[in-house]
Amino acid sequence: MKNLKQPIVAIAVLSIISGSPIRAQAQDDVIFKAMKDEMDRSMKELKIKGHEAPYFISYTVKDKDIVRIAGSFGAIDSKNIERDRDLNVELRVGDYDLDNTRFSDGGLFGMLMGGRMARGENITVDDDYKVLRQSLWSETDDAYKDAIEKLEAKKAFLQQNTVKDRPADFSKEKQVTLVEQPSRVMCDETKWSNTVRQLSAVYKDYPKVDQSIVMFGLDTLNRWFINSEGTKTFSARPEYVLLATASARAEDGYVVCDSEIFVGRSESDFPTVPEMEKRLRAMGDRLTESIKAPLIEDYDGPILFEGEAGGEFFSQTIGQNFGNPIDPLGGGLAAMMGSTNPLKDKFGQRVLPTFISVVDDPAATDYKGTKLFGGMSIDHEGVKPEKLTLIDKGILKTFCSTRTPSRYVKQSNGHSRYGLASTTNLFVTTDATTSKEELYKKLRELGKQEGLKSVLVVRRIQNMFTSVLDPKSILMGMMGSMRKRSGFNLLPASLVYRIDVETGAETIARITPFNGVGLNTLRDIVAVGDDSTAYPILLPTTSQGDALSIVAPSVLVKEMDTQKADKNMEKAPILPNPYFEQKAAK
């Protein structure tokens, strides 16, 4: 087993998924007072001669308590316990129709996916009014100077270029006041260090598992937000995450990766340590068996994504692409990135079978006794979230939106997380469920129609965290999706079974990465199961946000294909792990 430095990347990624708490705060505390006073002064007095004054300012202060503990093979690899506070300033010059945002001058960092990248700066963690005012003043000054430069460049671009159907740059929304109770969590660092040691030691019993990492994270976020329109919000939430990832390498060099994710708003949401250990051992068993299985390459036929794999299938395809597609003006890398959404230009068209709908419900808290984690009472722009029917009987009806309008959605529906539009609790629903027995029967029938001797059932799919252990397979999957027009990226499978079309007998297998998922593939979904289940989803699109949830059934896809085998895979280590060599010698 390798004690990797790479998993530290995963710790950084895990940091992206949470938030953190602070000390007890009143509605009119020193932070709100400093924000309000500096905003009032800026709206009244901030102006450079010959240029417009700001028409809109918002301030966000996030106070975060962060605990990170990572371990492997029964030992702690890293530990990080910190508190920080940062300030984000959004300042707009011009008016709601035309301002300094949504313009790319060719660089990535001023524009991200057609939206705006929030300005951020670490500030004092002390509730010192004068120091807070100084930080607010300095950041506001920088934001204003940048805004007037961007607006001038944008106006020059519009004079030289014809832009048809340009939407407004900012939507007008209702003033909101919402103040929640502060979040305050005391972490038992010794307890969780021992838990990480115990759980990571599981893989001392699995010689074929050559890489593994167990990470615990507790983020507690308290968030202050005000804007010049009069909106004022305070939101708070803790989030616990325990993530275990592991991999094993087959003799042909292909790596099989898997993970287990546990998410909670409190320790009581977690399973017991013995229950988590049982699941980690099951993962070790799966990996050990999988690398012995034959590799199936260049497969073209039906695939059943069963159970949790069904949730990942929907999450990684349509789920990550419900953000309102924004077309930035200008050019360069940012403009190119802003047009990559496969659902773009499919508004009002069929993207799924007519028996499938997709709903996003920010107010949902549980599904059949399983807690959901994506809900929020207010979004990050101070807009109350709406329940959305994103896809109705297969037809794409709307997108999750922020206050940045698009050609499709003109108003915010309260789905902003750190400036990006995001889902919350996603429900894949159907009025035509199919039993497990019927799904398998249809799968075999489809295989026979294609002249196949066997078909595939995928029961687990990799997620973004397993890329730390197997970056090459992730890259191969991305290349596969790029080769497909309007393709979605689907990460490689972690657990696959081959089903004999005649007898129904199943044997464990491995497959090469998928060649992406095209819109035609989604439209040709044959059936979904009656087994809808809730799963926590940690998406990169949440930027710095929280865990989300998806409720989805198993799904039978009529036709998918996988790549040809890569003949240049890295081989297994020449010498065995010394731990297992010494253990065998005893």
State the predicted function of each range:
Residues 1-6:
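Positively charged n-region of N-terminal signal peptides that target proteins for export
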Residues 13, 22, 233, 256, ...:
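Polar low-complexity intrinsically disordered regions enriched in Ser/Thr and small residues
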Residues 22-381, 392-395, 515-521, 526-529, ...:
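Active-site bordering "gate/hinge" segments
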Residues 8-9, 39:
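N-terminal, helix-rich and Lys/Arg-enriched segments in bacterial and organellar proteins
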Residues 381-586:
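Long, low-charge, small-residue-enriched segments that form tightly packed helices used
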Residues 9-19:
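Bacterial N-terminal signal peptides
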